[in-house]
Curated annotation (Swiss-Prot):
Cellular component GO terms, alphabetical: mitochondrial outer membrane; mitochondrion
Location(s) in or outside the cell: Mitochondrion outer membrane
Protein's name according to its UniProt entry: Mitochondrial dynamics protein MID49
Keyword Membrane: yes
Keyword Zinc attached: no
Amino acid sequence: MAEFSQKQRKQSGSEGLGSVVDFLLANARLVLGVGGAAVLGIATLAVKRLIDRATSPPDEDDTKGDSWKELSLLRATSPQKPQPPPAAFSQPLATGSPSPSVPVEPTPIHSPTTPKFSTIAPLCLTFQERLLAFERKHVITPEAHVTLAKQLAGDIALELQAYLRSKFPELPFGALVPGGPLYDGLQAGTAEHVRLLAPLELEPGLWSLVPGVDTVAREPRCWAVRRTQLEFHPRGCSPWDRFLVGGYLSSRVLLELLRKALSASVNWPAIGSLLGCLIWPDVASEELLLKVQHECLEFTLAVLMVVPGASTDDRLLLAWPLEGLASNLWLQDLYPVETARLRALDDQDAGTRRRLLLLLCGICRGHPALVRLGWSHLTQVVLHLGEEEVAWTEEALGERFLQALEFLVGSLEQASLPCHFNPSVNLLGNFREEEIDDIGYVLYSGLQVPESLF
């Protein structure tokens, strides 16, 4: 009986509140119009629901459907199209005299310091505009920084060359030559290392090259440097014989020798003080890297021991930290042929292939998941696309960028990125499955929302 009387009181209260709501809405239409009355009605109903819940016990039927109904109500009423501003704010005031029947109020005069909407940056930029803005901010290196980096790299090369000749006078190292993307106009900010080539002067006729696929390592990227003419020139005739492993010149032994020298024997603080910068070896890296810090810039110098091309059929072979059976082999350096091919393709049609490469390098270097994609991977992507007969103008740069992302995603799906100059080499062969998944997810998301990569 008590429950029945409680429901009766609730019903009578609801009817009384409902009549009040109807009265308010009827008068609100006259004053606020239809739109204002609708908003007032929704707010009134919400207040009514709160009162009902506070004055009555929870009902099972109400709790089941309230949540999604409230969400749908909010979803239906929240996105309203903004109405245009009144004419008084969008048009100048009339200069005629006011009507005598209407009292004139003083019009507030806005101060000259009122913010102007014309100074606000546009909120909607095209993808092409965002891409070019990223290029200007993160890719293009100031010419003064390029000049300073070249000067410091050249000075460090001279100091290191003098050290090698005094420390290892019996080893005929050639002149150390700085180079790399910085010297070829392909430096994406401070992303790429400055290359410092330390050539080994091998005796003609005492050394020959063996393709890596013909060795026990079966590595198509590498070459073995074999000692020959041992019957006429036995071991010990060449100063490089001390680095032989199984009759082959070992890149691993040479790397260990030079790494110990660079990290323990060279007085880098004194050299840095002389050149006006800080220099220290990166002992955590397997490569021979020198960190250079100037008050205006920072960059990394990679010291690369190479077997140059005159005696090796114009191939440039690098002493690189390889693993497994290939640890004593020499990695073929494709950088010279890659840059030459890109330059030739751009010269044919005044294209933007090298600009696309710099954009890809800048984005990948700035993303923790994409940093695994290095210069060689991105260069091969641009070379594969660069051979196609499509537009390579600046206006098509955004389209080519998205095309490069699609190509990378497709390559990651197959876990295969063939080398442009040697299709038997898979540049993704050393990637772990987790790395491929992480990179593929980021690139696929970037295809859906390209601006998220910037």
